[in-house]
Amino acid sequence: MKISVLTLFPEVFEMYLSQTILQRAIELGKMEYDIVNIRDYARNKHNQMDDMPFGGGAGMVLKPEAYWNYFQENFDFYGKENLNEEDLDGENNHEIGNENEDFKSENSKFKKPHVIFVTPQGKTLDHQKVMELAKKEELVIISGRYEGLDERVLEKFVDEEISIGDYVLSSGDLPSLVLLDSISRIKEGVIKKESFETDSFYNGILGFPQYTRPVEIDGYEVPEVLRSGNHAKIDEFRYKKAIEKTIKNRKDLFEKKILEDEKFKKEYEKLFYGKSK
């Protein structure tokens, strides 16, 4: 799988890619990353990437030309024509945005990446979406900045907009790293299967509490059952604690799980109330 990130600050990604689980994914041949300085694709005198918004307003908006050039130079699906600032001026904006529609529909053999724009206006990322994205052959993540990205880029190239939460950051670089990490770690072999299967959200609920040495600190002890060696009791304890944590911290997840998973509902009733049908 290949993931490309279009950013104005590629150096943000360098250390993370070289020292984390993402590096392991590279070494195992599970992932390929391309961190692109999108400014390199600008076609103006000073490689300017931002400009004032039409209609007025605070802040600056990322210009569209560099994104057009990136996609058309790197993917046959979009054609090869480079654009400069003048190409997007005047009354021909619509034509430029749609000029390759026939080309795309008639040439499906040309690869098309799945393109994501990370933005607080997108749908909130969850484990199910990460699993879905991990099945794609190639992703391109657009990392925004300033007040936003020219809407024509979204209309032309972006397949979906994704948010990592209902708050605003200075740029899309951190959300892009979140996507890189969350997708890479579930690729087969990158982490142990046992670790992946005990992650929060894997089974629709949060993960169970973890403990390590020492057994006691300042009066707080590791639960005795975890030291018993009885694996059946340990599994039951962990499952119950995971449910309790989900009810406490993410009641929405618990209620969804109860409604959609009859087996889980019966297990919950038996574990907490001794009911068995």
Show the residue positions of the predicted features:
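SAM-dependent methyltransferases
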Residues: 215-277
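Structured adenosyl-cofactor binding patch, chiefly the S-adenosyl-L-methionine
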Residues: 149, 153-192, 196
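S-adenosyl-L-methionine/SAH cofactor-binding core of RNA-modifying enzymes
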Residues: 63-139, 145, 188
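Short, well-ordered secondary-structure micro-motifs
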Residues: 127-129, 152-154, 209
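Internal, active-site/partner-interface "lid" segment
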Residues: 186-225
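Fold-independent oxyanion-binding glycine-rich loops
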Residues: 8, 38, 118-121, 143-145, ...
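N-terminal nucleotide/polyanion-binding subdomain common to many enzyme families
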Residues: 1-75, 227, 233-252
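Hydrophobic/aromatic beta-strand patches that form the interior of the parallel beta-sheet core
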Residues: 4-6, 34-36, 116, 139-140, ...
